[in-house]
């Protein structure tokens, strides 16, 4: 047998050689109401001996859940009934050890023999949490479209700050790569599991979809800036400098990973820092731009309303989850998530005040906005020259006023 063929056979057979006598729990996430019960199934996979069918499995103990100390395997399965004693966000039930035929050495691989059990206050709250979660996911996902539609309708991006757009693109690019690696890359997931054993996955498929979709939406909006009227707007030198710093930080982290100075998980984490920095900075340019123009024309209030809805519901979901399991650690153990959500809501309120209170009757200097047709500036000048006559002023053309 040639070496390449033998090598391929070894690669193919190695997983099956070592993936034997595994004790597994298929349903890793379980949820029960306090005082309720749930059955947890342990199963032996790829067994190599009939004697394993009489294995005694010792289980971990927790003050939040009640169950027998040990269970016996029957027909390669062992079931245990767990009672929810106290509210908890995720108690771990795991196989600690096992014995077979009086042997003190456990012949089973117990690495995957665990389940996370959440004891909740109410199923109604659990359903409400899911509804709120999907609602804010939907609100955030479509929040990019009002601005794109407004740009398309006006054939203009005047009023949309380019610093905000540029920072948003950098932030969501980093966030998309972060989610893709955390969800799909096996090395990243293995490193995360080593650092955070028995923890639920930090990134779900909907996180990946949202991040990639947000990046594409930002990219399309920037393409609109290349083709539509933009007046003399450009990306400021301060924004360019900040983006260079953020991108350089990402590349340096990537280089350190390639040179094995840091782990791949550390590089992925650095991408989340870029997103956090962008979120803290990106709203300032647009808010100041609206202030200097004394107008929010060109800046979609629909985008803000949807973002405000998503941010508010996100925090509401955190509150409902905390109430349902009597665990408020999400607010102080992970202050970054709560803080970034609060920053977004704070600026959304500022934008709403600017739009509805400070500058509600701003003049529209462009061709169309909210269905109101406005005179072309060139036509105004030409008509003024034609009909001014002896008039000393060309101020006869009044601006169109938009009343929201």
From Swiss-Prot:
**Residues in the Lumenal compartment per record:** 20-123, 185-207, 260-263, 317-337
GO terms classed as biological process: L-cystine transport; lysosome organization; phagocytosis
Under catalytic activity, the entry for this protein gives: L-cystine(out) + H(+)(out) = L-cystine(in) + H(+)(in)
Provide the topology term for how it sits in the membrane: Multi-pass membrane protein
Annotated PQ-loop domain ranges read 125-191, 266-327
Q: Where are the transmembrane segments?
A: 124-144, 164-184, 208-228, 239-259, 264-285, 296-316, 338-358
Q: Name any one GO molecular function.
A: symporter activity
Classification via InterPro entries: LC_transporter, PQ-loop_rpt
Q: What keywords would UniProt list here?
A: Cytoplasmic vesicle, Glycoprotein, Lysosome, Membrane, Repeat, Symport, Transmembrane, Transmembrane helix, Transport
Name of the molecule in the record: Cystinosin homolog
């Amino acid at each position: 047998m040639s070496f390449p063929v033998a090598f391929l056979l070894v690669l193919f057979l190695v997983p099956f050689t070592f993936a034997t006598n595994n004790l597994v729990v298929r349903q890793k996430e379980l949820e029960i109401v306090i005082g309720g019960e749930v059955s947890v199934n342990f199963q032996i996979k790829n067994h190599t001996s009939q004697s394993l069918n009489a294995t005694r499995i010792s289980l971990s103990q927790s003050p939040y859940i009640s169950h027998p100390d040990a269970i016996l395997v029957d027909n390669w399965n062992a079931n245990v009934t767990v009672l929810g004693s106290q509210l908890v966000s995720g108690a771990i039930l795991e196989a600690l050890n096992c014995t077979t035929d009086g042997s003190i050495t456990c012949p089973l691989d117990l690495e995957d023999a665990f389940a996370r059990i959440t004891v909740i206050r109410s199923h109604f709250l659990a359903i409400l949490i899911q509804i709120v979660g999907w609602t804010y996911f939907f609100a955030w996902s479509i929040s990019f479209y009002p601005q794109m539609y407004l740009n398309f309708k006006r054939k203009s991006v005047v009023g949309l700050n380019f610093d905000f757009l540029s920072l948003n693109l950098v932030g969501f690019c980093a966030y998309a790569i972060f989610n893709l690696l955390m969800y799909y890359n096996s090395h990243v997931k293995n490193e995360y599991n080593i650092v955070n054993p028995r923890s639920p996955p930090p990134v779900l498929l909907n996180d990946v979809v949202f991040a990639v979709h947000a990046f594409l939406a930002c990219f399309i909006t920037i393409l609109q800036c290349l083709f539509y009227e933009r007046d003399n707007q450009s990306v400021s030198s301060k924004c360019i400098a900040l983006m260079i710093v953020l991108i350089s930080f990402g590349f340096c982290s990537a280089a350190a990973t390639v040179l094995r100075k840091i782990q791949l998980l550390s590089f992925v984490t650095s991408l989340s820092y870029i997103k956090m920095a962008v979120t803290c900075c990106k709203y300032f340019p647009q808010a100041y731009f609206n202030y200097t123009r004394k107008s929010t024309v060109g800046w979609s209030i629909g985008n803000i309303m949807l973002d405000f809805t998503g941010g508010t519901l996100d925090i509401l979901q955190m509150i409902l989850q905390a109430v349902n399991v009597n665990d408020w650690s999400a607010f102080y153990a992970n202050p970054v998530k709560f803080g970034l959500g609060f920053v977004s809501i704070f600026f959304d309120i500022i934008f709403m005040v600017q739009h509805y209170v400070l500058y509600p009757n701003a003049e529209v200097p462009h061709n169309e906005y909210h269905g109101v047709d406005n005179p072309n500036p060139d036509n105004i000048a030409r008509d003024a020259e034609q009909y001014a006559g002896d008039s000393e002023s060309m101020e006869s053309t009044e601006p169109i006023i938009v009343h929201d």
